[in-house]
Amino acid sequence: MGHGTNRVEDMASPNNGTAGETVVEIHSVCLPPKKTAFQKLKKRVGDVFFPDDPLQRFRNQTWRNRVILGLQSLFPIFTWGSQYDLKLLRSDVISGLTIASLAIPQGISYAKLANLPPIVGLYSSFVPPLIYAVLGSSRHLAVGPVSIASLVMGSMLSESVSPTQDSILYLKLAFTSTFFAGVFQASLGLLRLGFMIDFLSKATLIGFTAGAAVIVSLQQLKGLLGIVHFTGKMQIVPVMSSVFNHRSEWSWETIVMGIGFLSILLTTRHISMRKPKLFWISAASPLASVIISTLLVYLIRSKTHAISFIGHLPKGLNPPSLNMLYFSGAHLALAIKTGIITGILSLTEGIAVGRTFASLKNYQVNGNKEMMAIGFMNMAGSCTSCYVTTGSFSRSAVNYNAGAKTAVSNIVMASAVLVTLLFLMPLFYYTPNVILAAIILTAVIGLIDYQAAYKLWKVDKFDFFTCLCSFFGVLFVSVPLGLAIAVAVSVIKILLHVTRPNTSEFGNIPGTQIYQSLGRYREASRIPGFLILAIESPIYFANSTYLQDRILRWAREEENRIKENNGTTLKCIILDMTAVSAIDTSGLEAVFELRRRLEKQSLQLVLVNPVGTVMEKLHKSKIIEALGLSGLYLTVGEAVADLSSTWKANGQP
């Protein structure tokens, strides 16, 4: 601004109407420091892709220290490995063995949920945890198969390929999907594109996980009721139809055993939730249930054949599966699509779980490192007969409560799984399928977070609607389409916020120089002759026309209000641009056009406090020159005071 910085004026106060000599200090609105196009681009790229400034720790370091810091950055195990001692090892061994007791039955159960051989679930609880222990930055994340990713993979692949009639092709697609999931996850981390997963909003995930939990629970009726011929579809209607259409296959022995062990598992879960110190009861109950139920089936095997069991599981380490990866053929697109969707879901869950427990212990989990760790873990897993894995909330909670100190607990868990694979597999021969169904039911029931849904209803109705779209989409359409519907609704919400931003009318709070929304503050009052508006978003091509029309409507409504109340003629419209973080050429054109149209109505347009980049573009586009000497101010208070004194000096009412 070109006008002076201090004036003494004889003016009327906008608050009480009394006249007096008041010092009005008018501050200039400055342009930001000049920068080259390259400097601007460099800063913008840094803000978008490197908000955490990962190279900061390397500055002012010797080459030797930089190499050490680089190794610690790539392999977090070097950060805490040098300080590892027997005390930490004891805690990690206890927690590792504890989560192993949960991981073994869950691994077998979740593999069946993905329509894969049970042994694949154990393979997936061996190799991935070892890789995560080296690459992961979370101390408490317990890695392995999870219910949601297993369900999504099973439902998407089985729509095109039968897991029973074409089991080899199905297995190939599962491993290939895992490979592409890993590539996608690692790429997000390497390219620092983690913000892409933010399109899965909290509301979307609440509805999706709840809907998936219901579908998973209903699918377990096959095992709980002893049904042999069951639908492979995942929607609620065909699942329930299959349950009642095959009533003749219901087995009372299976039902009794299922209800009994399900009651035990739910009771131990409830006890552990009420008294966290008794976490070990809930952690040990799945394995204990597997052992007891296996013994029961073994003892009564000659008296009844109604209870189905797992059967033979091969002993030995993970066989290599690199030769089974499917990189050409009719189903490649299906493998890629399944990999991306399961990759996004597992990545979202893993990072969320890791950050949850990191916040409890006051340390930080690096999101990009986690993406790379989980991605490389799944890529390696796909070559060693594993399917999609990530951090499990239930296992991580047990790991945390058991006193885990570092990622060594994952190594201990993997070692326990290794012993199981090498020596204990024949013991699972008579493990009944009904106990696996009960374990899955107990695990997924906690995914139905009705309290979070109620909070959405109380806080944000649109988020609640998104949650419902996700929930019912999964239940009645399909798992991937339900997720897609919810993401589409979330994107529509973003578009609405961008294309139809909020504008509000400001007034003065008496006795102060504070201007706030008339709708929020009842004591705020209008200033005669002024219409003060605040724009609460960037001005882009998508909303520039809307904002122009909305501001002109504000002006018409204000003039009509003045006529009805015989008030002071409207002379000036002030736009508070404090919240306008950016503007493009369409926005600049809209501001210029708005000034021209208001000028025809004998109304002055004044801009207040544009931020640096906006101010720079206003200056370069000559809009500042067009607005004139009194068209730009630092605060609303200064604008009102200066313009009022100018009008009074010119004899205007």
UniProtKB/Swiss-Prot annotation:
GO biological process: phosphate ion transport
Superkingdom field: Eukaryota
Extracellular topological intervals: 114-115, 162-167, 216-247, 301-331, 392-407, 455-471
Any one GO cellular component localisation term in the record: plasma membrane
Gene3D superfamilies: STAS domain
Pfam family for this entry, one: STAS
Annotated localization: Membrane
Topological domain ranges for the Cytoplasmic compartment: 1-92, 137-140, 189-194, 269-279, 353-370, 429-433, 493-653
Membrane topology: Multi-pass membrane protein
Matches recorded under InterPro entries: S04_transporter_CS, SLC26A/SulP_dom, SLC26A/SulP_fam, STAS_dom, STAS_dom_sf
GO molecular function: secondary active sulfate transmembrane transporter activity; symporter activity
The entry's keywords: Membrane, Sulfate transport, Symport, Transmembrane, Transmembrane helix, Transport
Transmembrane annotation, as ranges: 93-113, 116-136, 141-161, 168-188, 195-215, 248-268, 280-300, 332-352, 371-391, 408-428, 434-454, 472-492
Domain STAS: from-to ranges: 520-643
Coarse class of the protein's main subcellular location: membrane
Function noted in UniProt: H(+)/sulfate cotransporter that may play a role in the regulation of sulfate assimilation.
Family of this protein: Belongs to the SLC26A/SulP transporter (TC 2.A.53) family.
Protein name as catalogued: Probable sulfate transporter 3.4
